[in-house]
Amino acid sequence: MLEGRILADFRQTDASLHQGRPQSSSNSSVPGAPNRVSFAKLREPLEVPGLLDVQTDSFEWLIGSQRWRESAAQRGDATPVGGLEEVLYELSPIEDFSGSMSLSFSDPRFDEVKAPVDECKDKDMTYAAPLFVTAEFINNNTGEIKSQTVFMGDFPMMTEKGTFIINGTERVVVSQLVRSPGVYFDETIDKSTDKLLHSVKVIPSRGAWLEFDVDKRDTVGVRIDRKRRQPVTVLLKALGWSNEQIHERFGFSEIMMGTLEKDNTAGTDEALLDIYRKLRPGEPPTKESAQTLLENLFFKEKRYDLARVGRYKVNKKLGLNAGQPITSSTLTEEDVVATIEYLVRLHEGQTAMTAPGGVEVPVETDDIDHFGNRRLRTVGELIQNQIRVGMSRMERVVRERMTTQDVEAITPQTLINIRPVVAAIKEFFGTSQLSQFMDQNNPLSGLTHKRRLSALGPGGLSRERAGLEVRDVHPSHYGRMCPIETPEGPNIGLIGSLSVYARVNPFGFIETPYRKVVDGVVSDEIHYLTADEEDRHVVAQANSPIDAQGRFVEPRVLVRRKAGEVEYVPSSEVDYMDVSPRQMVSVATAMIPFLEHDDANRALMGANMQRQAVPLVRSEAPLVGTGMELRAAIDAGDVVVADKAGVIEEVSADYITVMADDGTRHTYRMRKFARSNHGTCANQSPIVDAGERVEAGQVIADGPCTQNGEMALGKNLLVAIMPWEGHNYEDAIILSNRLVEEDVLTSIHIEEHEIDARDTKLGAEEITRDIPNVSDEVLADLDERGIVRIGAEVRDGDILVGKVTPKGETELTPEERLLRAIFGEKAREVRDTSLKVPHGESGKVIGIRVFSREDDDELPAGVNELVRVYVAQKRKISDGDKLAGRHGNKGVIGKILPAEDMPFLPDGTPVDIILNTHGVPRRMNIGQILETHLGWVAKSGWNIDVANGVPEWAGKLPENLLSAQPDSIVSTPVFDGAQEAELQGLLSATLPNRDGEVLVDGDGKAKLFDGRSGEPFPYPVTVGYMYIMKLHHLVDDKIHARSTGPYSMITQQPLGGKAQFGGQRFGEMECWAMQAYGAAYTLQELLTIKSDDTVGRVKVYEAIVKGENIPEPGIPESFKVLLKELQSLCLNVEVLSSDGAAIELREGEDEDLERAAANLGINLSRNESASVEDLA
């Protein structure tokens, strides 16, 4: 039952997301894109890859989709194995304890999803598909095989936008940055002897750690599974090595020979027993149990797993099995021996080692923060690990059932219990730190959330333990993780964002693309390199000048070597070149124009604050962009993109119908005024007309925060940078009233209110218009069912849904029994539990959803009916709201002036916003000034005089930039945008207005006049257009006042905080202020009757009602609590009056209180409540 469409269909195919990719900064490769004039000088040989690929590719690997198999085949992987298949292969076969029966699984496959995305959101369902596997039971005694297709539960599926819908809410699984399994060599200095000590850890994906070290006495030791240290030769002997073999392999090393001499164990048996005693102290050791223990610890796949990536890292570091495919994922004897040899050579200062296969490997320590040693666990792997946990729990159940059930009657279905698997998946999506409520403030915040990299979470770091090193920017982050975008608080450096061009390889390492350079010639051949591969090469930056043939213009080129060293080298030595100047930054950072002129701290704030911008009623793309706006908007998935080329057949506010060239008809439905996760308004509107031709990949409808398919987070406002009467001191902002009147910065916010009718012990609750003791005026907007009508204006306290709950009934009097007999159930006692608009909220009802058990809707147990009401609120900009630019320049509105009082230009145009000059120099975000200048140039248009040839400053500009019309939109890509000289020249070449005046001089300043007096200001002022965003920190959400409200149960003091409708805390320092002024009575009142003197509160109310004098305050409740606490410590505390008589804290006060309260009609049984509705 849908009344007022809330959530419209939103369908978009995968192809539409990945077709038509724009070039670096012009939007030419996306059909129908707005023509943004670009100041870019460099050609980018590679288009920006799909920005959601990190999510979608990983999930496709997990489910083993056809598209993933095709791309794996292209990479040369002959037998690709999906994530689910991998888990089933690991698990199979499950054998019983005697080995006579086995159960194996294969061929995971999915049915159709149960309901489309919009229905799942609407009905609080999970967007999931049923998973089936083939289970095969083999009786080894008889050779009998039973095969069945088994249902393994509903598996949450990823939407085309890279999200999951769990119980109706959209969630994102964040990729996790973890230390890769492998061998890590470390170097420390001993505090007492200043000697260099070396150690190595063999870290598996799953299993016991193995650690070797050389101590200050020059002995080589080993720790198995974090237990006590032993000589390393004990482990070698336990592995079956004789003294002669150790001599033969390690004869070159004095420290190994010294360790062998100190080792007292005679042979393999004794060494095994010695290890067993250390690992299992207190248990009687036997040779067999010791042998089994060691084998299980490191050499059995069930207990120890290096994972493919760990095997790859170990082989690479130690030079083992070079060029051979990865097969085993356990440790081998050779791994252990090669690790010890590497450690010994490292300690002895050698720089290279020849591995057993003849491969020479460098001997060096490892940097744990290097991106060659940190990898990403993407969505697919995180879910796979959770399924593995569920499957191993199921394995135990299967084993037990094999032994208890009758062999003849056993089928795969009777053995399998899918509950542990389903529970494990549910637990991950519902409660994991990495499964997060999607940030839907605007399209950019959603896109950034999907590209987020987190070092926190299970198996990762914790905020408390993470030091500075792991948080810091590392040279290996270049092109992989953005050095700018990270949170400002305790998570700084632990949460990052994937760089624009980065991708994740099958091992989970982040790769970034480079152009191959051959003999000093830069080719368009693209190679993706991981961080440790990049270390072996010399890389030039993207803006190194090259000629038309791709040769470096200068003989010596600035390059980057290992560990971030920068130097000039001959061009013949260069191996690779960056593909783009914006390669190192993330999407949000790449949307900051003139980023190269901003301090990194402010750029960080700018990138983060773009994600907090609220969608405005009318979106406006920036005059000064970076060329990233279009791709970001398309890949965020909030715009509607045409799947196929064709002609628009029909357009309305709700849908667009396209007749494709192949004769098929496709209808795209618009989302109309839907509520996002963050209460902002997600609305789509068509930007095409009937009869218009569209191409595949063209944007046909705008979403929130987009204009013509480009990201549009704010507004272009005319800004003057000057102090004004001190009203814009300390980042305060002065606004023109025009922005309020014309709804320039107005946003729509939608709140969802929900109520359900349940079965209670006293009877069923009822949603009804028949509410006791409520006037007809209050019920005026309710329909006959008791639900508010769509379009009704509501404010706090208004009833949205009428509901009554049965009261506990007492013994009926004869009169009541008579009434009950005449009127039936109508007269029974009910109380009003209606859904009311919370305190401080108001708006217009825009939609209602009713779910009822009678209509066969799925509802939780005990719930008969559920009603949701959506209330939209139009919020104009007001004092106290927070505004920000894209350069970390943020401020709170301090004053809104009438337009006629604002400073104005010589032609009478008043400015929209005044920012203080002090906000620029010490913050070093000069980008905002350059943006202001270029904004003015773009708004005015320009024409460069080329009568005497192109001026020197315009020499690098493309021909189409020599002139532009007013209101042109421009892009200045990061690190490749407009230069300072070009800006100065363009300011001098701006077109005059209709009166023939050029209002802003070549220095970017204008003569401004005071709007109040008409007098000119004594100095010229910087004036231009800046892109300003309205952030989610709105004063309406923060302002709060309390009259009467809830009290804490124990202390009887008012609760705190807006959510609890709490009071303002009058703290210790405020009390001092009162004391300083001698305001004794005011202070006494604050500490007693206004706080927790329960008797006094009621008596004061009584006195006010009766017009009497306010009585003396009583004893605060918290004082009584203090006495009780002291008495609980066995301290007998008495309260004495000034004359030494004991004061009796009477319990009878409560009775007086109840009596007075009853006379006044006050309900004192109110307890601590989380919701304001319960206060009435």
UniProtKB/Swiss-Prot annotation:
PROSITE patterns assigned:
RNA_POL_BETA (PS01166)
- A single GO cellular-component term on record: DNA-directed RNA polymerase complex
SUPFAM superfamilies xrefs: beta and beta-prime subunits of DNA dependent RNA-polymerase
Q: Which InterPro entries match?
A: DNA-dir_RNA_pol_bsu_ext_1_sf (IPR042107), DNA-dir_RNA_pol_bsu_external_1 (IPR019462), DNA-dir_RNA_pol_su2 (IPR015712), DNA-dir_RNAP_su2_dom (IPR007120), DNA-dir_RNAP_su2_hyb_sf (IPR037033), RNA_pol_bsu_bac (IPR010243), RNA_pol_bsu_CS (IPR007121), RNA_pol_bsu_protrusion (IPR007644)
What biological process terms from GO does the record include?
DNA-templated transcription
Q: Which top class of enzyme applies to this chain?
A: transferase
**Keyword ATP-binding among record annotations:** no
Highest rank taxon of the organism: Bacteria
Q: Which UniProt keywords apply?
A: DNA-directed RNA polymerase, Nucleotidyltransferase, Transcription, Transferase
CDD domains recorded:
RNA_pol_B_RPB2
Enumerate the residue ranges of region (Disordered).
13-35
List the catalysed reactions: RNA(n) + a ribonucleoside 5'-triphosphate = RNA(n+1) + diphosphate
How does this polypeptide assemble, per the annotation?
A: The RNAP catalytic core consists of 2 alpha, 1 beta, 1 beta' and 1 omega subunit. When a sigma factor is associated with the core the holoenzyme is formed, which can initiate transcription.
Q: Which HAMAP family match?
A: RNApol_bact_RpoB
What task does this protein carry out? Answer: DNA-dependent RNA polymerase catalyzes the transcription of DNA into RNA using the four ribonucleoside triphosphates as substrates.
The name of this protein is: DNA-directed RNA polymerase subunit beta
Originating organism: Mycobacterium marinum (strain ATCC BAA-535 / M)
What lineage, starting at the top, does this entry show? Answer: Bacteria, Bacillati, Actinomycetota, Actinomycetes, Mycobacteriales
